């Protein structure tokens, strides 16, 4: 079931974000993600509109929107490749006519996922937090 993120979900969402980030970004040290956990819980998630995918009381994934962008889309490593990310992305696409996001250039799996879901790769830039190259991807209804 997809539902809005509640403040009571924050700890579980941050733990899921950490586990999925370490798994998906093996080109960035795990310490980087660990150092970002407090900001994710206290700044980024509260500032965003977020929805979770919950099953049997367990948070399996979440998506966050902030100022026209998909700010986060993370699925528990144990539940990836079962369509949960696509469902969360479709939930967001149903509410907006256009979206953009950034994805690390080295994250081939995420780039393929977003391309399969209608996003087009655009400009390349450096991530302000990690200094790694990332791509801006765009989606527009129509």
Where do the PLM segments sit?
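A short, internal acetyl-CoA/4′-phosphopantetheine-binding micro-motif in the GNAT/acyltransferase core
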Residues: 66, 70-80, 104
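Conserved N-terminal entry element of GNAT/NAT acetyltransferase domains
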Residues: 1-8, 139-142
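Conserved GNAT acetyl-CoA-binding A-motif
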Residues: 94-106
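A short helix-loop-beta-strand connector motif used in the catalytic cores of GNAT acetyltransferases and
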Residues: 41-52, 69, 133
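Conserved catalytic-core motifs of GNAT/GCN5-like acyltransferases
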Residues: 102-104, 120-136
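Conserved acetyl-CoA pyrophosphate-binding loop and the N-cap/start of the following alpha-helix
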Residues: 79, 83-91
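Conserved beta-hairpin
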Residues: 49-61
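Conserved GNAT-fold acetyl-CoA-binding loop/helix
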Residues: 10, 15-40
């Amino acid at each position: 079931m997809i539902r809005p993120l509640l403040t009571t979900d924050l700890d579980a969402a941050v733990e899921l974000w950490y586990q999925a980030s370490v798994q998906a970004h093996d080109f960035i040290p795990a310490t980087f993600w660990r150092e970002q956990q407090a900001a994710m819980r206290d700044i980024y998630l509260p500032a965003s509109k977020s929805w979770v995918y919950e099953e049997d009381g367990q948070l399996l994934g979440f998506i966050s929107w902030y100022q026209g962008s998909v700010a986060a889309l993370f699925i528990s490593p144990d539940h990836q490749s079962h369509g949960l990310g696509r469902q969360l992305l479709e939930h967001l696409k149903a509410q907006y006519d256009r979206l953009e996001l950034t994805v690390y250039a080295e994250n081939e799996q995420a780039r393929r996922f977003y391309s399969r879901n209608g996003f087009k790769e655009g400009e390349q830039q450096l991530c302000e937090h990690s200094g790694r190259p990332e791509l801006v991807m765009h989606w527009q209804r129509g």
